[in-house]
C-alpha cells in the first residue's frame, strides 16, 4: 500500500529523518494533486504546476545529497509511495538526467492510473532526454488545433461529462444533470480546456492515448482557429453516450465480472436521457453508442436507440461501438436501424477462437464471425458508411495483430484500429505491468516491435492509434 503519514516514521525516521520529512510534506499535498488533475481547485490550478512548485520548494530547503537520497528512497520502494511523491522524485530525476529512474517512476504511476498526464509526460521527456519536460510532441502541438472541445461531448458512467474519451482528455467539464441549464458546455473547466487547445499547449490532453495526437492527425492552426471563442452559443454537434457499462460479456481488459444494470437503474437512466440528453442529441448530427459497454447488451441503450430512430432528423446519425455478438439482422429490425447507422466499430481483441475465448469472456467466436459477415455485407452494399474492427493490444494477443488485419479484409471491413491497454482500476498495478506489452520495459516489448514490422501491418486500413507513440 502507498505510504501514509501513519507509517512514514516507522519506515524512515530512524534512518533518514530529513527524507521522511519531505515524503510527509508531499503526502499532505497528494489529495490536492489528485483534485488538480481534474481542475477541481480552479481552472488555473494545474496538476503539473503543483509538482514543479513542490519540487522547487523542496530544492530550496535541501542539499544536493538529500535530494539524491530522496530519489533513491522513492525509486527503491516505488510501490510504497503516493502519486505526488513519485512524480516529484521523477521530476528531480529528470532534472538530474537520470532517464531510467524517471521512466520507472512514471510507469509506476501509470500502472495505477492511466489518466495521469504528468507521469506520461515525464516518461516521454526521459525517452527524449529532455530535462525541461518539453518534447517533440509538445512542439508539434503548438502548431495544431482540435475541434473536439468546440463540438463534441461524451457522457460517463459516473454522471460526468467530458469533451471526448476520458483516457484522451481526463478532465470532466461538468455533470449530466446540469445539461438543461447549460451547466457543463460553457463551464469554467470547459472554457479552460478550449483555451489550452486554442493556445496550443494541450495541457489537459493525453499525448499517449489520444489517437489524433499519437497519430499526428490534428489539423494545423490557422488565424481562424486562434481566434475561436471559449464560450459557445451552439451545443455539441457530436454526442458520445458512455454512461451505462452493461454488456453481454466480461472482457478482462475493462472489467472483472459481467455488468448488467438492474431494471430500476435502467429506468432511472431512461429518465435521465429523456430529461437531459434528448434535447442535446436531437440537434446532433452524430451520436455514438457506446464507449462503456455494448449498445445491444444494455437495456438502457436499446431503449435509447429505439428513441433515436424515432426522433430527430432523418439520415445516418448513429455510430455503434459494439462487441458484435448481438449486432445482427434481428437487432436492425427490432430497433429500426436501417439507414440510421453511419459507422459500426466492433471490438474483438483476437483473430483466433482460443484467444478470443480468454479475452472476450462469454463470447462465441463462431457467432461473432456470422455477425461480422452480416455487417460486412451491409458495408459492401453501402447500407452503412464505415465498418472498423478494434483490437486492444496486450500480452495475450499481440502476436495475432497481422492475422487480425487478414480478418478485417475477409469481412469487408474498411480498417482496423489498434489501441493500448489501459488500467481502469480493475487490475492491480503489478498485474497491469504484466499485461502492458506496449510498455518499453515489458519483457516481450521487442517481440511486439517485430510484429508491428509484419508486411500486413502496412495495409492502408491499419490505424495504430495510441500505439503510434511507441
Each model region followed by its residue ranges:
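Conserved alpha-helical substructure of the radical SAM core
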Residues: 172-173, 212-344, 354-370, 378, ...
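Residues that mark the junctions of alpha-helical repeat units in TPR/alpha-solenoid scaffolds
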Residues: 43-50, 82
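Alpha-helical repeat scaffolds
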Residues: 22-23, 36, 64-74, 100-108
